[in-house]
């Protein structure tokens, strides 16, 4: 006679809560930390109440971002009480402890082993003979259909307004074969859009001397942005390049966009156009050459969307400098623009520059640049009315509507496409949409199947 099956009661694992702040690069770090903790046997909690420990992954790029991080730490302590701090503000442990003495541990940016060790110390996982049998599987904090793909860490540039190199160090590139393996797994799991990120995507592979690495299925790939983009484009997902520095070799990825191999989208933070301001920022200052290159890119790939960010009110920026920037934007006709008012950041060389711009002048210039770029955007989007565009669906509602993005729009930072008569669509679907209307930032349309 067979014995009845034995009931095995596994111990309940501790649960981890995560607050991830800042840029997509921080989000990828959070995913990596949680992936490791889950493979170690930890559970995840979507709220403070259910968490045994809360991780706060901080951002320290601007003083306003630091204040947001400190507020998040305070909220986590008030709501839960057991908090571990990691990320860019980890270098300011003394200041954090002075304000929040109850913090359990503080680790720095990309100190993955240290933060995982701190979690183990704070909330040990009960012994289980089954945990080691579970393979480590990637955990995502984004919707299933798009994923951020970090290809390197750190930066070799020393822009005067930036402290990222002091936090994250010089450029360290991942092996291209490892990046491609990760991308293949993401696509196999349902990712339809890969957003390539780093501190400086165009410098990828410089520290590896752009050498070639063997691929699992045969052949090889160089550690170089163009070669990596070409291989990623073969996976069948949209491939979107972010944080690109305007090196000459960026020209070589434009034909890949024209061929349809990667998404015709380029995120290049130009930061300014006035040569004196760019010089003070320690950025490239050949703005006329940049305009020539933009024209060349559009000649090769007419549908390319160019996104950029700019800083207004930088120390020493005169009204003449700012007007130069506005005139440059009129010529450049960029598709998507974000702007920031200059903020001093502790440790940044720009803090010591003369010619501080009054706050009221910063606000006035910020309003002017946003009005300028909104008008440019409105005209460019109006020209798309009547066209049919591929749109990736991000969300659907109960009334037959949906929201998605064209190839010209990255998630969260760019515009959206609002659809009517979109019943039956699901997030992640890529559909042809007839554009019916536009405003300053968004498009409005109907799926071609519904329009016919």
Curated annotation (Swiss-Prot):
Its EC number(s): 2.8.4.4
PANTHER family assigned to the protein according to its UniProt record, in alphabetical order: RIBOSOMAL PROTEIN S12 METHYLTHIOTRANSFERASE RIMO (PTHR43837), RIBOSOMAL PROTEIN US12 METHYLTHIOTRANSFERASE RIMO (PTHR43837:SF1)
Segments forming domain MTTase N-terminal: 14-124
Alphabetical list of NCBIfam families matching this protein: 30S ribosomal protein S12 methylthiotransferase RimO, MiaB/RimO family radical SAM methylthiotransferase
Protein name: Ribosomal protein uS12 methylthiotransferase RimO
Cellular component, GO annotation: cytosol
Any GO molecular function: metal ion binding
Cofactor or coenzyme needed: [4Fe-4S] cluster
Catalytic reaction list: L-aspartate(89)-[ribosomal protein uS12]-hydrogen + (sulfur carrier)-SH + AH2 + 2 S-adenosyl-L-methionine = 3-methylsulfanyl-L-aspartate(89)-[ribosomal protein uS12]-hydrogen + (sulfur carrier)-H + 5'-deoxyadenosine + L-methionine + A + S-adenosyl-L-homocysteine + 2 H(+)
């Amino acid at each position: 006679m067979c014995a009845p099956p034995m009931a095995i009661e596994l111990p309940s694992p501790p649960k981890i809560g995560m607050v991830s702040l800042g840029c997509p690069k921080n989000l990828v770090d959070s995913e990596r930390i949680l992936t490791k903790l889950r493979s170690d046997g930890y559970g995840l909690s979507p709220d403070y109440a259910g968490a045994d420990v809360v991780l706060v992954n901080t951002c320290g790029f601007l003083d306003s971002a630091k204040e947001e991080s400190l507020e998040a730490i305070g909220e986590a302590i008030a709501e839960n009480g057991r908090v571990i701090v990691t990320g860019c503000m980890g270098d300011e442990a003394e200041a954090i402890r002075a304000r929040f003495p109850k913090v359990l541990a503080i680790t720095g940016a990309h100190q993955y082993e240290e933060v995982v060790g701190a979690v183990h110390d704070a909330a040990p996982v009960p012994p289980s003979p089954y945990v080691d049998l579970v393979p480590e599987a990637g955990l995502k904090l984004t919707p299933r259909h798009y994923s951020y793909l970090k290809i390197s860490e750190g930066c070799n540039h020393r822009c005067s307004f930036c402290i990222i190199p002091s936090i994250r160090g010089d450029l360290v590139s991942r092996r291209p074969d490892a990046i491609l393996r990760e991308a293949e797994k993401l696509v196999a799991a349902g990712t339809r859009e890969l957003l390539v990120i780093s501190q400086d995507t165009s410098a990828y592979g410089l520290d590896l001397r752009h050498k070639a690495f063997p691929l699992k299925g045969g052949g090889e790939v160089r550690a170089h942005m163009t070669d990596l983009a070409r291989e990623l484009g073969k996976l069948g997902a949209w491939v979107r390049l972010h944080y690109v520095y305007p090196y000459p070799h960026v020209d070589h990825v434009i034909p890949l966009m024209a061929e349809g191999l990667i998404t015709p989208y380029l995120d290049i933070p130009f930061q300014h156009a006035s040569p004196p301001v760019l010089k003070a920022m320690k950025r490239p200052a050949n703005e006329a050459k940049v305009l020539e290159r933009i024209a060349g890119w559009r000649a090769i790939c007419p549908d390319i969307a160019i996104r950029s960010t700019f800083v207004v009110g930088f120390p020493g920026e005169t009204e003449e400098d700012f007007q130069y920037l506005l005139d440059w934007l009129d010529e450049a006709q960029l598709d998507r623009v974000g702007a920031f008012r200059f903020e001093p950041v502790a440790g940044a060389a720009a803090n010591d520059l003369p010619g501080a711009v009054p706050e009221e002048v910063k606000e006035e210039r910020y309003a002017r640049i946003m009005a300028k770029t909104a008008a440019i955007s409105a005209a460019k989007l109006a020209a798309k009315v009547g066209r049919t565009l591929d749109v990736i669906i991000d969300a659907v509602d109960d009334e037959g509507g949906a929201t998605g993005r064209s190839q010209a729009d990255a998630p969260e930072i760019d515009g959206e496409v609002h659809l009517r008569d979109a019943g039956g669509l699901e997030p992640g679907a890529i559909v042809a949409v007839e554009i019916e209307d536009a405003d300053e930032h968004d498009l409005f349309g109907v799926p071609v199947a519904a329009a016919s």
